[in-house]
Amino acid sequence: LSSWHVVMLKYLFSYARMKNLKVIMTPSNSNSFISDETDGYYLLENGLADGVILLEHVYDDLRVKFLKERGIPFVIFGQVEDDDVCSVSLDNYYVGYKGGSYLIGRGYKYIEFLVGEERFDSNKLRVKGFQDATGKSDGIFNIRYGANTVDKAYRIAKGVLEEEKPDAFFVSGDERAIGVYRAIQEAGYSIPKDIAVLGVDNIPMGNYLHPRISTVDQDFESMARECVELLTKLIDGEDLGNRKTSVFLPSVIEREST
């Protein structure tokens, strides 16, 4: 589990406990299911669990099909195009837009944006926001997909720094920025004197990086509470009306890395 998952799950467990709900984590993902009693979807299919919160979403997600076919209540954490599903999300377009605009406003003209896998809707939206923020500015603005772990972010940043010296790295995840910090320091550069770094998430460890990382914040607690509230209402058979989609806006927290 990433640090993002740890923080989000902490709040989900806390609010679920307040609603007297028990939480089971499942190893199944958008591509496959484990069809034995160790998996949450086995419990769902056999009437031993009441609902689901999905913490990731891709187009044509097998889990969504499974849940819809069986009429099982579920909430997706993520922005979705399907009006028939209930979702809670950070405004990922605005994450990219806000981060890009902030760095341009700070005077950076060569920015490398490191994001995770392209197949995730959240990453596509962040890239679109970043492109819209930087599209009318003079400079170099590159998108680097595949930075979905600390090590991969390190390797991508290292590869960039072997060829170029950007003004700033915008990293889609504070934890992954650890790898970027290492690559910058190994290349003999200083943060932020030579190269700035902006992260996303505002996870607690960001305060312990040196220098402390500037980040695009997301309100984990409010989003977790909304996920549990909506799922509880669905389980109870309540009509949500126009409340099927909840989107939370991010904000930039400026620290020493920019």
Where are each of the predicted segments found?
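Short acidic capping loops at alpha-helix termini that bridge into adjacent secondary structure
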Residues: 109-111, 138-141, 191-197
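Alpha-helical structural signal in soluble globular domains
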Residues: 11-15, 66, 70, 125-137, ...
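Glycine-rich phosphate/diphosphate-binding loops that line cofactor/substrate pockets in enzymes
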Residues: 100-111
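Hinge/beta->alpha junction and helix N-cap segments in small-molecule ligand-binding domains
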Residues: 1-7, 25-35, 88-98, 114-156, ...
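Short acidic/polar active-site loop segments enriched in Thr and Asp
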Residues: 50, 108-110, 166-167
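Flexible loop/turn connectors
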Residues: 158-258
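Alpha-helical recognition/docking segments in bacterial nutrient-uptake
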Residues: 1-101
